[in-house]
Every structure is written in structure tokens, then in C-alpha cells.
């Protein structure tokens, strides 16, 4: 269900699979959400570059992150994610959505740095644990939204 892992033996945990940091972007404009997706407008972002030895220092705020791994959710599975406890203990959290049956892509999440002193992250840091849940039966409909195949083309 997960491809392109940095180190599958390390990332495979008792209850799921850890996803690692590929890219960080900062928000540059406002987004818009309405009842249907016809008026959805995603905000502009700008990629932040990792510095010496692949480290980056982030100030408090919200960031869009992209993971290294490509996730493939079967028709009879859904997934939820939780931040790693080390991330929380450093004063940062991740906001995520549900991984629907049929979704395939290199997912993104919202990183929120709450620590007034910021946080330092290294490229490929393990940030999140994806937990897979088997459904009682295969989903009648599978994910077919705009994020299908995201960041892998």
C-alpha cells in the first residue's frame, strides 16, 4: 500500500507505516472553499529549500508538506494518520484528511509549528504514522477527486 519508502524496515511500525518529509512549502495567498468544488481555490505556495546537511529551520506558522511515499489505498481499506509523538513534543502538529478507498498519490498535509522558538526538520524526517483500517466490505465508490495521482506525475 506504500511505495517509495526511504527505509521500509524502519518505517513499518506495529500499527501502520510512517511517512517521511520530502518538501515544505509556505502559503503565499488565500484559499477558498464553498459547498461544492466549483468555487474551490487552492492558495499559492512557495517551496522552501533545505539548507546545509538537509536541515531547515521553521518559524511558528502553517506549512504545506509533501511526503516521499506514494500511498495506494485498496477498495476495502481506508487510512487515518497521526503525527509522531516526537513531532508533538517539539511543539508541532500535523493536520490530515482521510485517505479514501481507491486513492493513489504522494500525499500532502498541513504542518503547524506552535513552538514560539520554531522547529528544525531534516529532509526525510519521519513525521506521521499512517494507520490502515480494513472495511467490512469493498467500497461501492472509490476516490476520484482532483488529488488522485497527486505529486506523482
PLM-predicted stretches and their roles:
Residues 1-153:
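DUTPase catalytic domain/fold
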Amino acid at each position: 500500500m506504500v511505495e517509495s519508502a526511504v527505509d521500509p524496515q524502519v518505517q513499518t511500525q506495529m500499527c501502520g507505516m510512517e511517512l517521511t518529509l520530502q518538501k515544505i512549502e509556505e502559503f503565499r495567498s488565500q484559499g477558498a472553499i464553498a459547498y461544492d468544488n466549483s468555487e474551490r481555490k487552492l492558495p499559492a505556495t512557495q517551496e522552501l529549500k533545505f539548507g546545509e546537511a538537509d536541515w531547515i529551520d521553521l518559524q511558528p506558522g502553517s506549512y504545506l508538506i509533501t511526503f516521499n511515499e506514494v500511498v495506494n489505498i485498496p477498495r476495502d481499506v481506508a487510512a487515518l494518520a497521526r503525527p509522531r509523538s516526537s513531532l508533538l513534543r517539539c511543539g508541532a502538529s500535523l493536520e490530515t484528511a482521510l485517505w479514501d478507498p481507491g486513492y493513489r498519490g504522494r500525499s500532502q498535509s498541513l504542518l503547524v509549528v506552535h513552538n514560539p522558538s520554531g522547529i528544525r526538520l531534516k529532509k526525510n524526517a519521519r513525521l506521521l504514522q499512517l494507520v490502515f483500517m480494513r472495511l467490512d466490505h469493498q467500497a461501492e465508490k472509490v476516490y476520484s477527486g482532483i488529488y488522485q495521482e497527486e505529486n506523482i506525475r
